């Protein structure tokens, strides 16, 4: 399993509730944008040089290099978003509006998005946020994953998302199995078989489960 797959497995395990997923799809891009807007206030001046580097541009470039290293295709697809967030939008906002207004607005939106995400985890997901277990991974890779999860809306189905989500669905079904003594053979046998055959189990409209003794008693199996 690649580092990207392992990282998404970690992220997806904390984001399985549909409402919480939608909250993060909206809030994570806004968190990145507002953070870059605030970082746009700072510049780095090289020693013995008049050259100044905007911190927002530097952070955006670092994210871009990191994402392309993780996955060239998905990293390149996300590059216009990073360019927009780290360069175009901050520059336009500070040109059109006063610096104090932009900074205050960005800070407020940033805080609100964090609150909404904690609500998503506490109320809907009912599980602590991933950042409490792995802060660095959550902060750096979450924007790419939130972007990839919106891919199906435009007809793009990232393989890492569909495969990991399919495996999570199979595990969720396994956790809801009744008494294992009711089955003719272990549920794990079906999970392993299905995960190896079905490329995108998230598209299934039915549930695959092992045969139960009650199925035979009820005359379902002849």
UniProtKB/Swiss-Prot annotation:
Q: What's the catalysed reaction?
A: (R)-2-hydroxyhexadecanoate + O2 = pentadecanoate + CO2 + H2O
Q: Which Pfam families match?
A: Mpo1-like
Q: Which GO terms describe its cellular component?
A: endoplasmic reticulum; endoplasmic reticulum membrane
Would you tell me the protein name for this molecule? 2-hydroxy-palmitic acid dioxygenase mpo1
The question of whether Membrane is a record keyword is answered with yes
Q: Gene for this protein? A: mpo1
Name the residues that span the membrane.
Answer: 27-47, 76-98, 105-125, 135-155
Matching InterPro entries: Mpo1-like
Enzyme Commission number: 1.14.18.12
Q: What does this protein do?
A: Dioxygenase that catalyzes the alpha-oxidation of 2-hydroxy fatty acids in an iron-dependent manner. Involved in metabolism of phytosphingosine and is required for proper endoplasmic reticulum stress response.
Q: How does it sit in the membrane?
A: Multi-pass membrane protein
Give the GO terms filed under biological process for this record: sphingoid catabolic process
**Record carries keyword Nucleotide-binding:** no
Write out the similarity annotation.
Belongs to the MPO1 family.
Q: Its principal location?
A: endoplasmic reticulum
